[in-house]
């Protein structure tokens, strides 16, 4: 039993199939079945307005114009071979850029480890004030304060707290 009022007929002249879930073309605004809804499937006369692709180069992030009828993958490949400004061997970013400020130490770290007292940049081995002979914390005013009053003024971070605990157990 057919329901002629339910659904719509495909607008493709060679099909005219009654489709219960028709798809409307966003370019020509006609209804099509699942086989003819693509621009190529029904030879849409307004496809040039909608079927535009501008791929982006995965290396240099530049938009690459693609002419009508060209395959985007081929155009991107040609761009990467000829016109791409990114050269993997030349533009390599350094990872270990933060050099230790301790005299005689030449280590470099990925992350900046700044001393809270003298604000110098140090490697993991010299990151604590006692390890790099910190000059900012050696004033007479800072020596006069007790360790409990220092802890009350500023709450130590988890890393520094753990380091202090480990130093106490090692000594």
From Swiss-Prot:
It is found in: Cytoplasm; Nucleus. Pfam families: zf-AN1 (PF01428), zf-C2H2_ZFAND2 (PF25403). One of its GO terms (biological process) is positive regulation of proteasomal ubiquitin-dependent protein catabolic process. This is AN1-type zinc finger protein 2A. GO terms for cellular component: cytoplasm; nucleus; proteasome complex. Zn(2+) 1 binds at residues 10, 15, 33, 36. Zn(2+) 2 binds at residues 25, 28, 42, 44. Zn(2+) 3 binds at residues 100, 105, 123, 126. One of its GO terms (molecular function) is zinc ion binding. Keywords: Cytoplasm, Metal-binding, Nucleus, Repeat, Zinc, Zinc-finger. Residues 136-151 have a biased composition (Low complexity). The lineage of its organism: Eukaryota, Metazoa, Chordata, Craniata, Vertebrata. Residues 134-171 are annotated as: Disordered. Its main location: cytoplasm. A zinc finger (AN1-type) spans 4-52, 94-142. Zn(2+) 4 binds at residues 115, 118, 132, 134.
